[in-house]
Structure formats: structure tokens, C-alpha cells
Amino acid sequence: MSKTIATENAPAAIGPYVQGVDLGNMIITSGQIPVNPKTGEVPADVAAQARQSLDNVKAIVEAAGLKVGDIVKTTVFVKDLNDFATVNATYEAFFTEHNATFPARSCVEVARLPKDVKIEIEAIAVRR
């Protein structure tokens, strides 16, 4: 049985979906765009957008009682694969800052994202 994960520390869903689901041993987040949950603002550059998206994922994972180190898989959606190196640097710094092992990851270029942001990130975390 799944439980809905909801937190004010990540942006509210902008469609008919939830921020995340808790399956007991596994947490699955919805894709997180770089919206600051307090201000509703979106940073301009892709590095700041990547960081905000990761912070939003972290907030959902933590709302389920887990931590960044429990994330085992992410999917990164970018509007421009030329941003790959910048996103990688931000991503590496984020997981290093949280003393977390890098999770498995997919990264794909997409034509468009909600609110015309440059990046969206979703994650799977597990209870150990």
C-alpha cells in the first residue's frame, strides 16, 4: 500500500499528481522543476536550476524520513544537452556535500519542460 508524500519544502504539484509516494521500502518522487517553494521563483541559469531541483527532491525524500544518501536512482531531464557538464558539476557537488554515494542515473534531452525551465529531476530512494 502506498502513502502520499507531501511537504511545503518542495513546490506543490502543478497537475494531477503528488510530490511523491512512499511504498514502504521505496520512495518515488515526481519530477521536480526548479521552483523555489517559498517564493515561487525560478533561477535563471542552469546550475542554479539544477541545485533547486535537487533541493526539491531532497525535501521530498526527507519528508519520508530518508536522506540524500538513500537515493539510488535519478532521472535528469534537460532542455539542452550542451548543459550536461554544468549539470554534472552541480549534481556532483550536491551529492558530495551530503556525503552520499552517487546513485544510478539517466539523463535525457527533452523538447520542453513545465514553465519552460531548463531541467527537471526525479528520484527513487530506498529504506535500508
From Swiss-Prot:
GO terms for cellular component: cytosol; membrane; protein-containing complex. The record marks 17 as: Stabilizes the substrate. One of its GO terms (molecular function) is 2-iminobutanoate deaminase activity. The record marks 120 as: Important for catalytic activity at high pH. GO terms for biological process: isoleucine biosynthetic process; protein homotrimerization; response to toxic substance. Its EC number is 3.5.99.10. Pathway: Amino-acid biosynthesis; L-isoleucine biosynthesis; 2-oxobutanoate from L-threonine. It is an enzyme of class 3 (hydrolase). It comes from Escherichia coli (strain K12). It catalyses: 2-iminobutanoate + H2O = 2-oxobutanoate + NH4(+); 2-iminopropanoate + H2O = pyruvate + NH4(+). NCBIfam families: Rid family detoxifying hydrolase. Keywords: Amino-acid biosynthesis, Branched-chain amino acid biosynthesis, Cytoplasm, Detoxification, Hydrolase, Isoleucine biosynthesis. Homotrimer. This is 2-iminobutanoate/2-iminopropanoate deaminase. Substrate binds at residue 105. Accelerates the release of ammonia from reactive enamine/imine intermediates of the PLP-dependent threonine dehydratase (IlvA) in the low water environment of the cell. It catalyzes the deamination of enamine/imine intermediates to yield 2-ketobutyrate and ammonia. It is required for the detoxification of reactive intermediates of IlvA due to their highly nucleophilic abilities. Involved in the isoleucine biosynthesis. Belongs to the RutC family.
